[in-house]
Amino acid sequence: GDLPICGETCFGGTCNTPGCVCAWPVCNR
């Protein structure tokens, strides 16, 4: 399966996408 794409903006330090971490201001792996 394809891994979810990280890249949403994160404000509270958490990301909605599984496996992604907040590297302000965006989520990434």
From Swiss-Prot:
There is a cross-link at G1-R29 (Cyclopeptide (Gly-Arg)). One of its GO terms (biological process) is defense response. Pfam families: Cyclotide. Disulfide bonds join C6-C20, C10-C22, C15-C27. This is a cyclic peptide. It comes from the Eukaryota. PROSITE patterns: CYCLOTIDE, CYCLOTIDE_MOEBIUS. Keywords: Disulfide bond, Knottin, Plant defense. Probably participates in a plant defense mechanism. The presence of a 'disulfide through disulfide knot' structurally defines this protein as a knottin. Belongs to the cyclotide family. Moebius subfamily. This is Cyclotide psyleio B. It comes from Psychotria brachyceras. The lineage of its organism: Eukaryota, Viridiplantae, Streptophyta, Embryophyta, Tracheophyta.
